[in-house]
């Protein structure tokens, strides 16, 4: 059977782009906690000694944005000027406006409601906050129904942060990246071909020490032994030095790690970022709903792989289109799956927000290490509570 390689990457919470995602989502969470109806589009950029927060926010709540910024940066670990970025001394600039009235009128009352079409409770009044396409995906490669490459890459990044924060590897700094190449035989993952870790460190530690510690305390703790062999390639800080990192090394922006946030390139992506957006933005809520649908289809045994595309128009509640691809692994036709999705999942933005309880402040938790396949936190879009209904209707079981 033909063999091929597939690679996915992840980054730690100290990566400049991820700092921005976490700041944007910490602001969103703080606003939702005080005013669940907050409309938020919050973007962040970080560079040497500076954080800029800009966006459009409509809310009855007040939050101290500079304080939230400093708390978030402190939690990540940038607490000393020698790291190139310091939570206590960095400048914080804010530029916040209200949400555009033109956008608000489309979200506040969807087109179907305005034209007198069917209104169920208040759900139909919530139109999509923008046009766009969103994809959801699931596969049975891992217990969490995620592709193996991105799953391993995220676990390596989380472990890299864990050994830093616990002091097990005390010379590490917050910035870091991981990358995993998996070798497949047909559709089955058979081994890890390559592991790459770039970890920011203090300037006095040797490369040999870094390599030894990261192999023993990170790679071997994360990657199952049966997937590693003598031919597995391991690269640790291949440039030879990673002292300057974080915002001092690279400018960061919210929404620049959309592939890391989702499926590591294993599935298609509609292009919309998640962080800093309240759930009326379908870039976020519909992508979560699409994952929920795909995961339940795979968990029900109706396909080994499932990708779903949703399309929305601003101000219109119902999806314009639903497309499902099971890559030849479906136990029923894709037309049947679309029929089941329409029957068992309400994909209007208002219904997604209601069913997945998306007005709660849960977003900072997923702003690093992936929004999907998380086993460390209970996420509503990761639940498989539709499995029995889907299996019964599809297979008669």
From Swiss-Prot:
K(+) binds at residue 43. One of its GO terms (molecular function) is methionine adenosyltransferase activity. Pathway: Amino-acid biosynthesis; S-adenosyl-L-methionine biosynthesis; S-adenosyl-L-methionine from L-methionine: step 1/1. It catalyses: L-methionine + ATP + H2O = S-adenosyl-L-methionine + phosphate + diphosphate. GO terms for biological process: one-carbon metabolic process; S-adenosylmethionine biosynthetic process. Binds 2 divalent ions per subunit. Binds 1 potassium ion per subunit. Pfam families: S-AdoMet_synt_C (PF02773), S-AdoMet_synt_M (PF02772), S-AdoMet_synt_N (PF00438). Its EC number is 2.5.1.6. It is found in: Cytoplasm. Residues 99-109 are annotated as: Flexible loop. The keyword Translocase does not apply. GO terms for cellular component: cytoplasm. InterPro entries: ADOMET_SYNTHASE_CS, S-AdoMet_synt_C, S-AdoMet_synt_central, S-AdoMet_synt_N, S-AdoMet_synthetase, S-AdoMet_synthetase_sfam. Mg(2+) binds at residue 17. CDD domains: S-AdoMet_synt. L-methionine binds at residues 56, 99, 250, 281. ATP binds at residues 15, 175-177, 241-242, 250, 256-257, 273, 277. Belongs to the AdoMet synthase family. Homotetramer; dimer of dimers. Catalyzes the formation of S-adenosylmethionine (AdoMet) from methionine and ATP. The overall synthetic reaction is composed of two sequential steps, AdoMet formation and the subsequent tripolyphosphate hydrolysis which occurs prior to release of AdoMet from the enzyme. HAMAP family: S_AdoMet_synth1. This is S-adenosylmethionine synthase. It comes from Clostridioides difficile (strain 630).
